[in-house]
Amino acid sequence: MPVKFGKVLIPQPRSKFVKIRCPDCGNEQVTFSHAAMVVRCLVCGRVLAQPTGGKAKFAGHIVKILE
C-alpha cells in the first residue's frame, strides 16, 4: 500500500529585507527588518535602525520591502 502524505504547511518567515532612505542625505540602503545591531547610514553616519529585541525601529523612510 502506498503511503499518503497530507499537505505540509510550512510557515513563512516574518522578517524581510527593507530599503531605507536616510532623511539627512537621501542615501538608500538595504537592511534587515529584525536588525540586531544599530544600522548607520554609510554616507553621513546617521542611525537608520535601532534594535528593539524584535523588529528594528527605523528612523528613515522605508522605500521598499524586498522579498
Swiss-Prot record:
GO terms for cellular component: ribonucleoprotein complex; ribosome. Binds 1 zinc ion per subunit. The keyword Mitochondrion does not apply. This is Small ribosomal subunit protein eS27. Belongs to the eukaryotic ribosomal protein eS27 family. The gene is rps27e. Keywords: Metal-binding, Ribonucleoprotein, Ribosomal protein, Zinc, Zinc-finger. Zn(2+) binds at residues 22, 25, 41, 44. Gene3D superfamilies: Zn-binding ribosomal proteins. The keyword tRNA-binding does not apply. PANTHER family: 40S RIBOSOMAL PROTEIN S27. Its cofactor is Zn(2+). It holds the Pfam family Ribosomal_S27e. It comes from the Archaea. Part of the 30S ribosomal subunit. GO terms for biological process: translation. It comes from Pyrobaculum arsenaticum (strain DSM 13514 / JCM 11321 / PZ6). PROSITE patterns: RIBOSOMAL_S27E. One of its GO terms (molecular function) is structural constituent of ribosome.
